[in-house]
Amino acid sequence: MTNGKIWLVVKPTVGLPIGMLFAALLAVLIHGLLFVDGRLKSWWSEFPVAKPAVVSVQAAPAPVAAEVK
């Protein structure tokens, strides 16, 4: 495990919280940029007022009686 050598330089009690904070800030930044760009607002603004989908049910055709000879 070559990546495990980082903990010889940085203590896990310091490195793990910094890594988790970095991941959380990156996620907030990405979502913020998508929201400002309008990619999240386009469907989010319509979500609370969305109407249920209209489903049309078609009756099954009646079976055709077989001719008896």
UniProtKB/Swiss-Prot annotation:
Keywords linked to the UniProt accession: Antenna complex, Bacteriochlorophyll, Cell inner membrane, Cell membrane, Chlorophyll, Chromophore, Light-harvesting polypeptide, Magnesium, Membrane, Metal-binding, Transmembrane, Transmembrane helix
Transmembrane residue ranges: 15-35
Gene3D superfamilies reported for this sequence: Light-harvesting complex
Source taxon at top rank: Bacteria
GO molecular function, one term: bacteriochlorophyll binding
InterPro entries reported for this sequence: Antenna_a/b (IPR000066), Light-harvesting_complex (IPR035889)
Pfam families per the UniProt record, alphabetical: LHC
UniProt keyword annotation of Magnesium present: yes
Binding residues annotated for a bacteriochlorophyll, in chain numbering: H31
GO biological process entries: photosynthesis, light reaction
Cytoplasmic side: 1-14
Protein family per UniProt: Belongs to the antenna complex alpha subunit family.
Subunit record text: The core complex is formed by different alpha and beta chains, binding bacteriochlorophyll molecules, and arranged most probably in tetrameric structures disposed around the reaction center. The non-pigmented gamma chains may constitute additional components.
Function as written in the Swiss-Prot or TrEMBL entry: Antenna complexes are light-harvesting systems, which transfer the excitation energy to the reaction centers.
The name this protein goes by in its record: Light-harvesting polypeptide B-800/860 alpha chain
